[in-house]
Amino acid sequence: MQTYSTPLTLIIVTSLFLFTTQGSSSNAVEPTKKPLKLANYRATCEDRTRTLVTRLNTSHHSVVWQRYDIYSRYMRRMPPLCIITDAYKETTHQGGATFTCTRQNLTLYNLTVKDTGVYLLQDQYTGDVEAFYLIIHPRSFCRALETRRCFYPGPGRVVVTDSQEADRAIISDLKRQWSGLSLHCAWVSGLMIFVGALVICFLRSQRIGEQDAEQLRTDLDTEPLLLTVDGDLE
């Protein structure tokens, strides 16, 4: 009896440990390495309200709304936002955002950029899943869209969002481009003048050489032939 008590105790302790580990890991945040197949893409701005509406028929079914964080190396499955079983509507909070869930839609309030992610609806009765890829843009980006001057590069690669700053950036950019073009034209013009001066000097030197040779030939043709006779006088 004592021979089997130690292995039996070991088996019981190991089983309890595995059961406890599985139970605690099911409630923890679990990373997933497999990307989700996304069909729906949505976008909104910070501090706005956005509603995600499912196309699945989830009437009278238990559903789960869940969020996947995409800022980590792998998409992390966060704790469920809402689990709708008997209640028609449920409101919950995660971070600074507020979520109101029903079987058909998920409404998000007070969003920030950190709430960007994949929002998943799973029908627990049929097993159907629908994913929404929700992008939350910062306020500066949305203000830039409203002024219709978004993503204009200002000094130091800064995105200019204010209209007056954008006007100043456009003017300074045009001045910079014009000065660069003027400098380039001046450099090309100077180079062409220098090359032209060299060509003119070369041609003039050749012409002067030819004139000197012609003058020398002319002088040789017109110069009288002088004969000197040396002799003794008696």
Curated annotation (Swiss-Prot):
Q: Name one GO cellular component term.
A: plasma membrane
Compartmental location: Host membrane
Q: What is the recorded membrane topology of this protein?
A: Single-pass type I membrane protein
This protein is called what? Answer: Membrane glycoprotein RL11
Q: Transmembrane ranges?
A: 183-203
Q: Key word Signal present in the record?
A: yes
Organism in which the protein naturally occurs: Human cytomegalovirus (strain Merlin)
Q: Which residues form the signal peptide?
A: 1-23
Per UniProt, the keywords (alphabetical) are: Host membrane, Membrane, Signal, Transmembrane, Transmembrane helix
